């Protein structure tokens, strides 16, 4: 018997420690597997800590086994991220997963996943319609689900959890999902006494502020950041033709021309703001930037272990 947690640990923090302790307490007969992203994340960010460090700290705080989520899944949109992660869970004959959820209503997520599975033709028609209107894929997916179910999934952990359960239902995997209540107050503006979101902690780290109240991890500047690689990204985009940019994975729908148009923006944040639109979310843009920076045409053939950034030396626990 085993239970899986699908994680990025960017960075590992007290909320993750609580999840491991909760899982060990409530599933005492199960080995805990972490399906863990490597050095890059689903939102297109460079992980603050490398895979090896994240693995060590997870094992220290209660995980039994670490399985790496391949780059080709770890740096994709939520539905592809979930597809890869749940496929790995099934391959390793792990019969349970547990994830944080704002609603903590796993039965409703199953209900919606079954409704989606039984109405894929209608769902796909609504999805296609929304994409034609210029919606981003996440917004189009939410629109299509609401059209067939009358419900919106609005919280980020519920959205990702729904994607996990969709994969379980669609593939009839012998896996049962469980949830751990995660407060919607668990945010940038409302950190709890000793627990804060990874987003908030990344902000503190980037501002060179201590996160010791919220995490056992320590970081020294300069830390890993896509913003620090923006000059290199500018150089590549300026020197590469649109035709050759379009050969890179995720560079489609003319996004290469949009990048060319705004490549003289003076910094990463201004570039993001210039390129961001209803169709292209920040995460979609950042994922594309990662693929351009490392000239990745086929993510299944990309060995991220060959990328060694000095900033990964500036972290530990």
UniProtKB/Swiss-Prot annotation:
This is tRNA(Met) cytidine acetate ligase. PANTHER family: TRNA(MET) CYTIDINE ACETATE LIGASE (PTHR37825:SF1). Catalyzes the formation of N(4)-acetylcytidine (ac(4)C) at the wobble position of elongator tRNA(Met), using acetate and ATP as substrates. First activates an acetate ion to form acetyladenylate (Ac-AMP) and then transfers the acetyl group to tRNA to form ac(4)C34. Keywords: ATP-binding, Cytoplasm, Ligase, Nucleotide-binding, RNA-binding, tRNA processing, tRNA-binding. GO terms for cellular component: cytoplasm. One of its GO terms (molecular function) is ligase activity, forming carbon-nitrogen bonds. It comes from the Bacteria. One of its GO terms (biological process) is tRNA modification.
């Amino acid at each position: 018997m085993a239970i899986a947690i699908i994680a990025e640990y960017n960075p590992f923090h007290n909320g993750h420690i609580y999840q491991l302790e909760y899982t060990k307490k409530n599933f005492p007969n199960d080995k805990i597997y972490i399906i863990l992203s490597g050095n890059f994340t689903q939102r297109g960010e460079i992980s603050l800590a490398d895979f090896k460090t994240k693995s060590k700290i997870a094992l220290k705080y209660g995980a039994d086994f670490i399985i790496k989520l391949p780059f080709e899944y770890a740096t994709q949109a939520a539905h592809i991220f979930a597809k890869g992660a749940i496929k790995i869970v099934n391959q390793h004959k792990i019969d349970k997963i547990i994830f944080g959820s704002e609603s903590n209503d796993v039965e409703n997520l199953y209900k919606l996943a079954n409704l989606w599975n039984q109405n894929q033709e209608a769902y796909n028609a609504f999805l296609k319609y929304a994409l034609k209107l210029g919606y981003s894929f996440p917004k189009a997916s939410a629109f299509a689900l609401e059209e067939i179910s009358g419900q919106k999934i609005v919280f980020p952990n519920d959205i990702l959890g729904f994607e996990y359960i969709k994969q379980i239902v669609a593939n009839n995997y012998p896996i049962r999902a469980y949830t751990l209540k995660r407060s919607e107050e668990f945010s940038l503006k409302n950190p709890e006494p000793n627990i804060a979101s990874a987003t908030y902690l990344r902000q503190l780290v980037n501002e060179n502020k201590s996160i010791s109240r919220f995490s056992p991890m320590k970081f020294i500047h300069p830390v890993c950041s896509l913003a620090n690689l923006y000059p290199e990204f500018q150089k590549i985009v300026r020197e590469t033709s649109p035709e050759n940019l379009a050969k890179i994975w995720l560079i489609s729908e003319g996004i290469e021309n949009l990048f060319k148009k705004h490549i003289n923006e003076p910094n990463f944040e201004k570039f993001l703001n210039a390129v961001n639109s209803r169709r292209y979310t920040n995460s979609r843009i950042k994922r594309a930037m990662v693929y351009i920076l490392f000239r990745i045409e086929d993510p299944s053939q990309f060995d991220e272990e060959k990328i060694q950034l000095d900033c990964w030396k500036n972290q530990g626990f």
